[in-house]
């Protein structure tokens, strides 16, 4: 495994370089780290019309958070049963 990323530190470093928007794509560990670091402002989530079973993690895995982050649905598109959603932090 590679070195761990500290989300809050990475966001600050990129902001110091003048970056005002970030797009992160990854798995449950990266998303969980972003949530725990309290640096997630927006979430784009795709829901597929398929079900499977197994022991996979939740959408976000990692450190616990004291209070859940609240988001508001800002847009939703449907195509062939797939839902493309966008949420913004409230």
Locate each region found by the language model:
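Enzymes that bind and transform nitrogen-containing heteroaromatic metabolites
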Residues: 1-90
């Amino acid at each position: 495994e590679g070195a761990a990323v500290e989300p809050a530190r990475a966001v600050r470093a990129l902001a110091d370089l003048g970056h005002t928007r970030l797009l992160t794509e990854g798995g449950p560990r990266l998303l969980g780290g972003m949530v725990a670091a309290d640096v997630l402002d927006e979430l784009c989530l795709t829901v597929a019309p398929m079900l499977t079973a197994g022991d996979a993690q939740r959408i976000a895995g990692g450190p616990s958070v004291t209070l859940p982050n609240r988001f508001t649905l800002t847009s939703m598109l449907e195509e062939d049963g797939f839902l493309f959603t966008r949420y913004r932090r409230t």
